[in-house]
Amino acid sequence: MKYKNALIHSLLVGLIAAFVILVSGWLAVKAWVVFFGWANYFLHACNMKKSFKMLLAFFVGIFIALIGTYAITYLNTIASENYELYVTAFIVFWIATILIFLEIIEDWGEFVPATFLGTVLFFASGVSLKSIIPELFIPLLIGIFAGFTTLFSRDKLTIYLNK
């Protein structure tokens, strides 16, 4: 019975993953961002209520990274060309400091990793201010929905299989 349930759950997740690829293609969004949101749904042991807080944490991180990018760009215009690496390190120091300081906010500590990952997501995706919504927000929502769907359908399937 254990192997049968595991196989059926695995097939279910495979089916959802294939559907995510199709939806990503149809909507012309980056599938890796969708999978990023989906994986983080599980990493943060989310439910629907927590998932919106996680999404907010992603966007706090994205916003901080956006401000950091503008600061790096500005400081590089006034600093000598030889100091670009040091300017970037200086700004990243402040970004990391701010992110960890967010732990003092009650009920936010568990979402600091999502905030960190939001900064990573921004820097890795190469999006601009104008493309954050279609290139990050929409795919993250799809990923969170895939995570919710996985847990919901897995729970229902487990109940059905164990009858």
Predicted ranges, named:
Residues 20-35, 78-93:
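Structural signature of hydrophobic alpha-helical transmembrane segments
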